[in-house]
């Protein structure tokens, strides 16, 4: 994928890679784990999207995590996605964060509490030094189930439900 040409960038378009692989874009991204701003979720809810306020989605974020720091009101343990602090701290980044703080930009120790305005080290989806993508966290543990067939190079047209339970997909 590419962005549309933009006249403010001399009509350039920018490559925008997407994860057409098991695990989706979590298999190709920079490993950063960030949920987004609380106020953005609340605006989605205010626009009529029931179930999308910060307080509505927070329990699902907590359930998804296996947070290295431990569980609390914002983080969970025992979930399928391993979330940890970055192992490498770079002096140049520390200097940048100190400079940002000097001009009034706060340091942030946890970008996943709903207010991620500021500067700091992001957490990553990593386990034992390896990427913990959605495929690693969710698919690998169940990939040998007899009732699961993994298909690649397919396009899903529809998720089929019985009552409120997804039971299959229609694809080509």
Model-derived features: positions:
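N-terminal glycine-rich phosphate/pyrophosphate-binding loop and immediately adjacent elements
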Residues: 1-62, 170-171
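Conserved redox-cofactor binding core of oxidoreductases
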Residues: 45-166, 172
């Amino acid at each position: 994928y590419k962005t549309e040409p933009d006249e403010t960038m001399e009509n350039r378009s920018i490559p925008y890679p997407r994860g057409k692989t098991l695990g989706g874009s979590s298999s190709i991204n920079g490993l950063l784990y960030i949920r987004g701003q609380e106020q953005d979720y609340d605006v989605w809810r205010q626009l009529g999207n029931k179930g999308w306020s910060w307080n509505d989605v927070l329990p699902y974020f907590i359930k998804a995590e296996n947070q290295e720091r431990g569980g609390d009101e914002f983080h969970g343990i025992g979930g399928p996605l391993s979330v940890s602090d970055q192992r490498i701290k770079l002096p140049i980044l520390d200097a940048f964060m100190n400079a940002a703080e000097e001009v009034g930009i706060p340091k942030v120790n946890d970008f996943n509490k709903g207010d991620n305005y500021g500067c700091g080290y992001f957490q990553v989806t990593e386990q034992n030094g390896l990427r913990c993508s959605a495929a690693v966290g969710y698919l690998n543990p169940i990939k040998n189930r007899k009732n699961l067939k993994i298909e690649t190079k397919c396009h899903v047209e529809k998720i089929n439900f019985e009552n409120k339970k997804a039971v299959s997909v229609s694809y080509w």
